[in-house]
Amino acid sequence: MLRDTMNSWNDSQSDLCSTDHEEEEEMVFGENEDDLEEMMDLSDLPTSLFACRVHEAVFEVPEQKERFEALFTIYDDQVTFQLFKSFRRVRINFSKPEAAARARIELHETDFNGRKLKLYFAQVQMSGETRDKSYLQPPQPAKQFLISPPASPPVGWKQGGDATPVINYDLLCAVSKLGPGEKYELHAGTESTPSVVVHVCESETEEEEETKNPKQKITQTRRPEPPTAALSEPRAFDCAL
């Protein structure tokens, strides 16, 4: 009985271990598949290659040109070629980035007419929107005219109309009732504050004020004259020889 229970316990433990190993393998392989899919994503790669240091016969001999093009037509039937004889380069344009990547991996540094073929990916041409997003944008000129006035008004600026002047008609009416020589109490005084009284002047022009209150003139002091006796008498100089 004890032997049977031990055998059953060992069988259960082995089943548990096998299931754990299977789950771990599934998790590992599942993660590896996701990583492989991410690594095999070739959508960002360019679809063109540049072949550098190409043999001169490719540009001059039609048979060598056909032989060179046959190397790349295996990967893509719709491939096109652009020959730059002065630079000894050929641009190979594929229809898919996968074909360009395979040709780059398999044909790079292979011998062609006694020379190693150098293959490089062409630079990806960015559109206008992506090119603008790759650089830091200047701030929006919404409130820059508040810092310094611009040469021309900003977009959407409209000149505001002048506000109508505020006229206090009650004040004008009170001033018109004032007469010369009289005083008017505006605010009555209290125990802690004095009263405010307005005295109206009798004269209305400055000329009348000057005639009634003439300005005091300051007489300048006369300069003293030199004595006449000192100027009239001749001076004698004694000279002994």
Curated annotation (Swiss-Prot):
GO terms for molecular function: calcium-dependent protein serine/threonine phosphatase regulator activity; nucleic acid binding; phosphatase binding; troponin I binding. Residues 183-203 are annotated as: Calcineurin-binding. Residues 1-17 have a biased composition (Polar residues). InterPro entries: Calcipressin, Nucleotide-bd_a/b_plait_sf, RBD_domain_sf. The lineage of its organism: Eukaryota, Metazoa, Chordata, Craniata, Vertebrata. GO terms for cellular component: cytoplasm; nucleus. It comes from the Eukaryota. One of its GO terms (biological process) is calcium-mediated signaling. This is Calcipressin-3. Belongs to the RCAN family.
